[in-house]
Amino acid sequence: MTIPGSKGEILTNEICKACSVRSVALFKDLDLEVFDRFHSAIREVEIGKGDHLYNIGDTGERVYTIRKGIIKLVQYLPDGTQRIVRLLKQGDLAGIEATTGSTYQHDAIALTTIDTCAIPLKTVEMLATEQPQLHKTLLSKWEDALSTSDSWLTRLSTGPSRYRVIRLLIWLAENTSE
């Protein structure tokens, strides 16, 4: 299967080990020898501004570590109105719901050019059985996603629009390097 936006490049061991988001990525705690065995399954995927990384209802076959850029996760109201439910930034994990066997629950749309590492779920599942620390890291990623969602609900979806925009700009300034 072709990965949308894939450069078709397998990231080398050296690139992965020196990656700027390695310290916060899903596989941050893996032993280097374990890392050496599986890294060839990861593909670099670049998506242009406005393009979709995945869509609501698609079968979740991969999770994506965001290396650069911002992705908005959107859902739709019954009348078709788009609602941004979360923004993902460098170091975040997109498509995490796929780890439960679920389809993707959002449209993931690039707000900027994004660079990601596409990690097959089969790789995540295989490593989770032999590397217990991966389970803890995955739970931590879930907790981060839940905290971010809570923050969006309390800070960015209530109050006058002027204040919501200000809070969004503050969030962007604090959470992005772009």
Question: Language-model segments: what does each one mean?
Answer:
Residues R22, G57, L153:
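Conserved short-loop catalytic and cofactor-binding motifs
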Residues T2-G48, L93-A94, A98-G101, E130:
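Cyclic nucleotide-binding regulatory module and flanking cytosolic helices
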Residues L26, D51-T113:
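Cyclic nucleotide-binding regulatory domains
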Residues V45, Y76, E97, L127-E130, ...:
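Histidine kinase transmitter module recognition
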Residues C117:
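Conserved active-site beta-strand element of glycosyltransferases/polysaccharide synthases
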